[in-house]
Amino acid sequence: MKSSAAKQTVLCLNRYAVVALPLAIASFAAFGASPASTLWAPTDTKAFVTPAQVEARSAAPLLELAAGETAHIVVSLKLRDEAQLKQLAQAVNQPGNAQFGKFLKRRQFLSQFAPTEAQVQAVVAHLRKNGFVNIHVVPNRLLISADGSAGAVKAAFNTPLVRYQLNGKAGYANTAPAQVPQDLGEIVGSVLGLQNVTRAHPMLKVGERSAAKTLAAGTAKGHNPTEFPTIYDASSAPTAANTTVGIITIGGVSQTLQDLQQFTSANGLASVNTQTIQTGSSNGDYSDDQQGQGEWDLDSQSIVGSAGGAVQQLLFYMADQSASGNTGLTQAFNQAVSDNVAKVINVSLGWCEADANADGTLQAEDRIFATAAAQGQTFSVSSGDEGVYECNNRGYPDGSTYSVSWPASSPNVIAVGGTTLYTTSAGAYSNETVWNEGLDSNGKLWATGGGYSVYESKPSWQSVVSGTPGRRLLPDISFDAAQGTGALIYNYGQLQQIGGTSLASPIFVGLWARLQSANSNSLGFPAASFYSAISSTPSLVHDVKSGNNGYGGYGYNAGTGWDYPTGWGSLDIAKLSAYIRSNGFGH
């Protein structure tokens, strides 16, 4: 493994730098509670903010939401046998295992692993009893959404919702762990939507088209997405015309579809068969999100370009952007898995792993991603653009206090980091280094995310690399992400040069979709196969050997083999394709 940081990593356990609440709190009992006679069981949703985490930064009083104020929640249910599902997800994707390639079918999931109808109805009855309405159960029975009030939340889950500020943004959160009556303790996993301040964000860096720069490592310039197949040696592979690809978005994509049509027309490509899918409430907000527009443009055009100009279908799973916290994204992930149509799904979004763990999202979504892996689906997730400071990169980075991004830290996804890409004068691959652009004028670090999870255990397939003992390490692989060597993307009809690990992930998605088409969509979740194959055959990747993803002497360094900034490096698709044909990878 490549060498890590020169200075010792300290876990990011104190998540909140700015929480504007006074400490003069008599007790949480002042907020009230459900009847003492109720016997409560814990859930995965912790107190999102507690007195011990509060820093008194203003004179604003701590106020509980009025009982009648509206609240939208999503209840995540436990699998009937989560351990067995995770074992199955490993077995069907582990070369040499007797179950290899025997992916879980939707009907099998419902009969063996999904919560039973009786369990679902028990939770529905509890919600209805406490005043929730518009209760909706998703087809695979993993999520139940409902509309209610702060009073209903307190009655149903034994926690108040209070107003507070985080990083200058006002919102609300639960000040006690969410609980359920004991008879629901083995059914309910998380109660989501109890905080609305921290949300997942895109992983992109937008700029104007820059002039090419010739350096010792090669030429650094922006790239038409159609150039990535040549650069990463995929030209000999078939297009992804036989593979369906998914993209997770927040809000609508009407402008994205117009920009995608302009991209295909400008490059002489056929129009893409697309479908948009609303994944949350039918009354949700699925209008175009101007802030995220460049993200969905980057995702779709980079996927199609890397896929050789064709995919069977491009499915946009649109999250309700009005949903509380990250509940909309959780619903979008689940819809893609419940449908089980897209073979590979792009996620160019992420947020602080510690926050995801605190509100229960980490556990809820990990069940969804594990189901996807068991079904042979692959989620590709950007590793983050904050270097080693995903949780504390709001101003100048916090020294040796490192953190990573969720959902990239899930062991059931492929985490994709970022590089700075150099090409030859003829446009072929020359070299890559760790993507790190240093601090911007606001003191924010722009660099590839990488490190280790505080909450996720090390998967067995990572045993071939060292690193922090027992922890999920990330990223797994990397591709181009630097804004200066990024993709030339149509955004509102105009070309912009965009980078970030939001570029790296869709490059992989498009290339992986080509390999899926070449292998009749028989390839499953490839993490175990990647680690096994690359560790024994290093020529399958472009090893990234220089660079760092921190600042001021902190962060992790690149070197030979797997490392924290770039994982194994970028894939050589022609060599990987030949390896698959020769070694039965995925069959």
From Swiss-Prot:
Subcellular location(s) of the protein: Periplasm
Signal peptide: 1-32
Activity regulation note: Inhibited by 1,2-epoxy-3-(p-nitrophenoxy)propane (EPNP), but not by carboxyl proteinase inhibitors, such as pepstatin, pepstatin Ac (S-PI) and diazoacetyl-DL-norleucine methyl ester (DAN). Inhibited by tyrostatin, pseudo-tyrostatin, AcIPF, AcIAF, chymostatin and pseudo-iodotyrostatin.
Record GO cellular component, one term: periplasmic space
SS bond partners: 352-391
InterPro entries: Peptidase_S8/S53_dom, Peptidase_S8/S53_dom_sf, Peptidase_S8_Ser-AS, S53_propep, Sedolisin_dom, Tripeptidyl-peptidase_I
Recorded superkingdom: Bacteria
GO biological process per UniProt: proteolysis
EC top class named in words: hydrolase
EC number: 3.4.21.100
Known function: Pepstatin-insensitive serine-carboxyl proteinase. In vitro can hydrolyze various synthetic peptides. Also shows activity on acid-denatured hemoglobin and on casein.
Protein name: Sedolisin
Organism: Pseudomonas sp. (strain 101)
Gene: pcp
